[in-house]
């Protein structure tokens, strides 16, 4: 019975520590850790529209600029499409979770639809070479909220927005300036054989 319990515990720990799934083509794939990428297509769908927050085009632009900037800083972005080792097709669904008490008790404190409570950041990345897909991966990151010392500052601004009933529309630039790091981290974690 103890052996079974240890085996079960090991299986649970292995599942919790797993990385994203990488779907690789039938032919063996080798992607060096120094490979460079070029952003071929970048599509963003924004869910949860609200005039208080950034327009869809601005969200799309900020996420794309942040992704390219992070790849440049990691020395993984090519100088041109022709010089890139791999091309990337990125599809993003950016979902705002906007507070709505539907006339509940909180409405007496802060107006509905003025507080961005969290965001969902879901994405699929296809890595291509010579026009053919080499691999793809996807992630669904739900309920993301500001964290760390910069996030604590954003949370304080949100609390001030609640107390003054002015909302927290400024927190969205915090999200759009950080979320692309998840994609870059996943690209960095692609196994090289």
Please give the residue ranges for each predicted region.
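Sec-dependent bacterial lipoprotein signal peptides
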Residues: 1-16
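C-terminal/domain-edge helix-coil "capping" segments
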Residues: 17-29, 126-193
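Flexible, solvent-exposed loop segments that connect beta-strands
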Residues: 46-55, 103-111, 152-161
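Solvent-exposed, acidic/flexible segments
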Residues: 56-64, 114-118, 164, 168-172, ...
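Short, well-structured beta-strand/strand-turn elements
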Residues: 73-83
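Surface-exposed short loop/turn segments
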Residues: 82-150
């Amino acid at each position: 019975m103890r052996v079974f319990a240890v085996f079960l515990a090991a299986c649970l720990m292995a599942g919790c520590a797993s990385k994203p799934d990488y779907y690789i083509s039938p032919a063996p794939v080798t992607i060096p850790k120094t490979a460079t990428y070029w952003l071929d297509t970048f599509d963003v769908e924004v869910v949860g529209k609200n005039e208080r927050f950034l327009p869809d085009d601005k969200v799309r632009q900020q996420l794309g600029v942040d992704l390219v900037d992070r790849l440049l800083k990691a020395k993984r972005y090519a100088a041109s499409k022709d010089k890139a080792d791999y091309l990337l097709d990125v599809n993003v669904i950016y979902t705002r979770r906007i507070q709505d008490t539907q006339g509940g008790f909180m409405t007496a404190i802060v107006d509905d639809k003025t507080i961005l409570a969290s965001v969902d950041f879901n994405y699929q990345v296809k890595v291509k070479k010579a026009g053919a897909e080499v691999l793809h991966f996807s992630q669904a990151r739900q309920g993301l909220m500001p964290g760390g010392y910069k996030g604590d500052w954003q949370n304080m601004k949100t609390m001030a927005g609640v107390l003054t009933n002015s909302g927290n529309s400024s927190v969205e630039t915090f999200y759009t300036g950080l979320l692309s790091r998840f994609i870059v981290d996943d690209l960095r974690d692609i196994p090289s054989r």
